[in-house]
From Swiss-Prot:
EC id: 1.18.6.1
Residues bound to [4Fe-4S] cluster: 95, 128
Molecular function per GO: 4 iron, 4 sulfur cluster binding; ATP binding; metal ion binding; nitrogenase activity
Cited Pfam families: Fer4_NifH
HAMAP family, A to Z: NifH
Source organism of the structure: Methanospirillum hungatei JF-1 (strain ATCC 27890 / DSM 864 / NBRC 100397 / JF-1)
Protein name: Nitrogenase iron protein
Annotated GO biological process: nitrogen fixation
Keyword annotations: 4Fe-4S, ADP-ribosylation, ATP-binding, Iron, Iron-sulfur, Metal-binding, Nitrogen fixation, Nucleotide-binding, Oxidoreductase
Length: 280
């Protein structure tokens, strides 16, 4: 069983990337489970025809963990992709990472981990104990960073590199960075900047996903791009990402940058703007 986790800043496109990746993988004849590890609980929505499935944490609160079965928490989506949403606490109460911990404990008790590949879609703004659990407990052995060329997105990706590096010091866990996915925001020299960042931390870009309105059209139809526009160039990009991940053998313990190094790197790839807002 192959277990991978996609980490990145909130709003960067992790869930869109994860759902299209899962769709591409199941189209290859693999059995796939996608686990959304974000309180927004929308990771699997496009695999479920737009349905927001009940979260594990909500079900535990409502019915008690001991009363739940596998069919209560695992839902079947596009072409058989098995979908799970960890969920989070009520606003202003508790720890968001708790949903991930509770979900994994329940899925283990119910013997749910038996797919060819499991895709964890994980919030990466704050890599606290709960959100780091897929790495810390050895569930996800291959980590992929989803980022754009925006500084805050790169900052989150760099923090995840710090978490991987720290967790990898525990010889009992095998947790490695498999590559960087550039989800473009159409910034100047964005692919070069993200490629330079990947190189600096010891890794590489494994996919460049261009910004496209096709994603919005697909999601308005409650579908992934893979399902909505299977012959499009964007669909081919997601299929290529699936191929890269399935054949990847290049895994590293990353070397995170200091914040000053990261900012210097970002500045070197952005156009100079004077006090009047004019590019040079």
């Amino acid at each position: 069983m192959k277990q991978i986790a996609l980490y990145g800043k909130g709003g960067i496109g992790k869930s869109t990337t994860s759902a299209n990746l899962s769709a591409a993988l199941v189209n290859r004849g693999l059995s796939v489970m996608q686990i959304g590890c974000d309180p927004k609980r929308d990771s699997t929505r496009m695999l479920m025809k737009g349905i927001l499935i009940p979260t594990v944490l909500d079900l535990i609160r409502e019915r008690g963990e001991e009363n739940l079965t596998l069919d209560d928490v695992v839902f079947t989506g596009y072409k058989g992709v098995r979908c799970v949403e960890a969920g989070g606490p009520e606003p202003g109460v508790g720890c968001a990472g708790r949903g991930i911990i509770a979900t994994f404990q329940l899925l283990e008790r119910l013997s749910a981990f038996d797919e060819d590949i499991i895709v964890y879609d994980v919030l990466g703004d704050v890599v606290c104990g709960g959100f780091a659990m897929p790495m810390r407990k050895g569930y996800a052995q291959e980590i992929y960073l989803v980022t754009s060329g925006e500084l805050m997105s790169l900052y989150a990706a760099n923090n995840i590199c710090k978490a991987i590096s720290r967790i990898s010091q525990n010889v009992r866990q095998v947790c490695r960075l498999g590559g960087v996915i550039c989800n473009s925001r159409n910034l100047p020299d964005e692919e070069k900047l993200v490629g330079a960042f990947a190189s600096e931390v010891g890794s590489k870009i494994i996919a460049y996903i261009p910004r496209s309105g096709l994603v919005q059209y697909a999601e308005l139809n409650n579908q992934t791009v893979i399902e909505f526009a299977p012959d499009s160039s964007l669909s081919a990009t997601y299929q290529s990402l699936a191929e890269e991940i399935m054949t990847n053998t290049d895994f590293v313990i990353p070397k995170p940058l200091e914040i000053e190094e990261l900012e210097k790197l970002a500045r070197s790839y952005l156009p100079t703007i004077d006090h009047q807002g004019i590019n040079h």
